[in-house]
Amino acid sequence: MSDINATRLPAWLVDCPCVGDDVNRLLTRGE
């Protein structure tokens, strides 16, 4: 499921800008 989530990340990120903003910060900090 983690692999699928990673592949779908960009897809749902664009679909959910509200949640994407929060995840974007996590990704930026992670990388």
Swiss-Prot record:
Modification(s) after translation: Processed by the macrocyclase-peptidase enzyme POPB to yield a toxic cyclic heptapeptide. POPB first removes 10 residues from the N-terminus. Conformational trapping of the remaining peptide forces the enzyme to release this intermediate rather than proceed to macrocyclization. The enzyme rebinds the remaining peptide in a different conformation and catalyzes macrocyclization of the N-terminal 7 residues.
Glycoprotein keyword on record: no
Keyword annotations of the record: Thioether bond, Toxin
Keyword Lyase part of the UniProt annotation: no
MF terms (GO), sorted A to Z: toxin activity
Cross-link (2'-cysteinyl-6'-hydroxytryptophan sulfoxide (Trp-Cys)): 12-16
Family under the similarity heading: Belongs to the MSDIN fungal toxin family.
InterPro entries according to UniProt: Amanitin/phalloidin
Protein name from the UniProt record: Phallacidin proprotein 1
NCBIfam families assigned: amanitin (TIGR04309)
Origin species: Amanita bisporigera
Function description: Major toxin that belongs to the bicyclic heptapeptides called phallotoxins. Although structurally related to amatoxins, phallotoxins have a different mode of action, which is the stabilization of F-actin. Phallotoxins are poisonous when administered parenterally, but not orally because of poor absorption.
Location in chain, cross-link Cyclopeptide (Ala-Pro): 11-17
Positions annotated as propeptide: 1-10, 18-31
